């Protein structure tokens, strides 16, 4: 074959003409100008994004979030972990409804009662001391004394007491003395019962005869959930839950190990 000449191959027949669909051209208004935005650093104003992750939160919010994460990451001993097992909502509602009937009197109510008594005494009608009505007893020291003397019928402890050391001994003491106890969500709810912002623990000492049946039912349910399960609760550790980054890192290492083992085995 002489140099410079190209070999002629067979020409492929052209494809049959495909009828092209004619697209309707969009009518563009020349008055509308395209002005694309540049979201680079120092350029256009950034679009609205969810920046929750980058917010500098107040100190108390940071602390409570860090505390919650620490409780998940670290191994939590059973004595502290038992405070995560709060009473179910239905039983807690019934308990609070009953406790609401036995709220102690406010300062204003006490003042009015004493004033009425003083007026009666001044009028010469005689001073007859009234019997103290059954009310809730609040506070760690008061409740501890009542439990030790076996005068408490039911003890209610808040789950979020800070520092937790204030009430960490109470469940063990209640079980030892045979007093039914329960852990309820919210120290503020207990505080509301006794006209304070928060309250660590409250106790029932006496109730009126019409409420004895309701209290007995509650005590039975609470005893089953807490006092009778004490040995099980005592063995149950909490926390030790890794975060998503750690889980992903461990999974990656495991995957690499499995791959290496597979190549060795062939």
UniProtKB/Swiss-Prot annotation:
Subcellular location as annotated: Cytoplasm
Disulphide connectivity of cysteines: none
Keyword Ubl conjugation attached: yes
Keyword Zinc (UniProt): no
One Pfam family it belongs to: Ribosomal_L7Ae
PROSITE patterns noted in UniProt: RIBOSOMAL_L7AE
Family matches, as InterPro entries: eL8/uL1-like, Ribosomal_eL30-like_sf, Ribosomal_eL8-like_CS, Ribosomal_eL8/eL30/eS12/Gad45, Ribosomal_eL8/Nhp2, Ribosomal_eL8_euk
GO cellular component labels: cytoplasm; cytosol; cytosolic large ribosomal subunit; membrane; nucleolus; postsynapse; presynapse; ribosome
Covalent cross-link Glycyl lysine isopeptide (Lys-Gly) (interchain with G-Cter in SUMO2), where: 11, 20-21, 48, 97, 125, 245
Modified residues (N6-acetyllysine): 34, 97, 217
Keywords: Acetylation, Cytoplasm, Isopeptide bond, Ribonucleoprotein, Ribosomal protein, Ubl conjugation
Transmembrane segments: none
Any one GO BP annotation for this protein: ribosome biogenesis
GO molecular-function term, one example from the UniProt record: structural constituent of ribosome
Primary localization class, coarse: cytoplasm
Role according to the record: Component of the large ribosomal subunit. The ribosome is a large ribonucleoprotein complex responsible for the synthesis of proteins in the cell.
Protein family: Belongs to the eukaryotic ribosomal protein eL8 family.
Subunit structure: Component of the large ribosomal subunit. Interacts with CRY1. Interacts with DICER1, AGO2, TARBP2, MOV10 and EIF6; they form a large RNA-induced silencing complex (RISC).
Full protein name: Large ribosomal subunit protein eL8
Gene name in the database record: Rpl7a
């Amino acid at each position: 074959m002489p140099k410079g000449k190209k070999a002629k191959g067979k020409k492929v027949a052209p494809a049959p003409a495909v009828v092209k669909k004619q697209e309707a051209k969009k009518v563009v208004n020349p008055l509308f100008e395209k002005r694309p935005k540049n979201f680079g650093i120092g350029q256009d104003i950034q679009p609205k994004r969810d920046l929750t992750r980058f917010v500098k939160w107040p100190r108390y919010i940071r602390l409570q979030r860090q505390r919650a994460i620490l409780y998940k990451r670290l191994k939590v001993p059973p004595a502290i972990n038992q405070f995560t097992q709060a009473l179910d909502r239905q039983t807690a509602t019934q308990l609070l409804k009953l406790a609401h009937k036995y709220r102690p009197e406010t300062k204003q109510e006490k003042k009015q009662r004493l004033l009425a008594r003083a007026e009666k005494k001044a009028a010469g009608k005689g001073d007859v001391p009234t019997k103290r009505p059954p009310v809730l007893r609040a506070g760690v020291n008061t409740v501890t004394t009542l439990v030790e003397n076996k005068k408490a019928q039911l003890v209610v402890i808040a789950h979020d007491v800070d520092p937790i050391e204030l009430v960490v001994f109470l469940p063990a003491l209640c079980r030892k003395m045979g007093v039914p106890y329960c852990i309820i969500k919210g120290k503020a709810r207990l505080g509301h019962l006794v006209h304070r912002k928060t309250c660590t623990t409250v106790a029932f000492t006496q109730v009126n005869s019409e409420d004895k049946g309701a209290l007995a039912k509650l005590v039975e349910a609470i005893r089953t959930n807490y006092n009778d399960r004490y040995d099980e609760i005592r063995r149950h550790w909490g926390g030790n839950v890794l975060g998503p980054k750690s889980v992903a890192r461990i999974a990656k290492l495991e995957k690499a190990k499995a791959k290496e083992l597979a190549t060795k085995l062939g």
